[in-house]
Amino acid sequence: MADDYYQTLGVDRSASAEDVKKAYRKLARKYHPDVNPGNKAAEEKFKQVSAAFEVLSDTRKRKLYDEFGPDAEKIGFDEKKAEAYRAYKASAGSAGAGGIPYGAEGFDLGDLFGDLFGGRGGGAAGGAPGGFDIGEMFGRRGRNAGPERGEDLTVRVQLTLAEAVSGTERPLAFNRPGRCSTCSGRGTSGPVSTCNVCNGTGRARRSGSLFGGAGACPNCHGTGKAAPPCPQCGGAGVKEELARLTVKIPAGVHTGSKVRLSGQGAAGTRGGPPGDLYIETEVAEHPLVRREGDDLHLDLPVTVSEALLGADVRVPTFQGEVTVKVLPHSQSGRRMRLKGRGVPSLKGGAQGDLYLHLQVKVPEETTAEARAAAEALARAYQGDVRRELTL
């Protein structure tokens, strides 16, 4: 089973959103790649922490995770279908009955795909005990219907802020419904003939059905035609496969940005075209740099003498080091703007800026020399510096 996200962040399952955020920030600062350059273990831990925060910081994702566990994050997961399927499994008296939150017996997505694609349960005809048709419940058309386009898929990718600013290439490996090689996606393994259950009418009475009366024939799904199902895919025309590809992430993405890869989604059924693949980015917080839109903000420490007398200071940026001039008599909190040193615009506009916020740092140890300098400096002030401090 996948790592427990609550354990990864070190919080209770009842933790508030603020507690989750505090735990994430603490761990992100500890394991961030910029703080641990070249440390693969820290990098892997940072990815785990970011993945846990992505789910537990989102109310809807957290609800699904609490109810269905890690299966809710898998490609192709559909909450409504999962709820309906679990209710069906419970009514059929199967193990792992519905209504049990994740953490007890859990929810098995494998059962869902197995029954849909003929792995077990639903079988080639797509039927179920009591005349209940899983295929119709999930909106699946008959295996002899026309070609259907495959579903669009979404894969989430974790990025550092540096990768989001500069752009990157990322190798991906993920599971997706691929075209069955045995039947070339048709779902059948023999000639099409008149359905022997409904005699070509497409309608059949179902004894023991949930609503009674006649409905779409469970054998041909209302088409009136039938053919032997493919033994490999159970008539679905698709089988799960491991896909590998490299995706180029453009500079300027933010959390929630999507990169579309045409034709890289789920395979179409019965020879239909494949869906698209969407790469959704999740940009981790940086321990030092804050992002606001396309602008970046960085606190710049300076010494007392640099603030008083002025100085040329080296500053790291995502585009390389630059030298900035700190003006004499600069106060703590003074803001300096570096034009075009922020985040590129995804819309093709001007690049954002980098804002430096001066932070005057005093010595951490008071030596005799420092004390004498401070006493001499105190005499340079003109009156009480707090004389205008009124409420």
From Swiss-Prot:
Domain J as annotated: residue spans: 4-69
Molecular function terms, GO-annotated: ATP binding; heat shock protein binding; unfolded protein binding; zinc ion binding
GO CC annotation: cytoplasm
Binding site for Zn(2+) 1: 180, 183, 230, 233
Binding site for Zn(2+) 2: 195, 198, 217, 220
ZnF CR-type: positions: 167-242
GO biological process, one term: protein refolding
Per-repeat ranges for CXXCXGXG motif: 180-187, 195-202, 217-224, 230-237
Gene3D superfamilies (alphabetical): DnaJ domain, Heat shock protein DnaJ, cysteine-rich domain, Urease metallochaperone UreE, N-terminal domain
Signal peptide bounds: none
HAMAP family: DnaJ
Domain notes: The J domain is necessary and sufficient to stimulate DnaK ATPase activity. Zinc center 1 plays an important role in the autonomous, DnaK-independent chaperone activity of DnaJ. Zinc center 2 is essential for interaction with DnaK and for DnaJ activity.
Oligomeric and partner information: Homodimer.
Descriptive protein name: Chaperone protein DnaJ
Protein source organism: Myxococcus xanthus
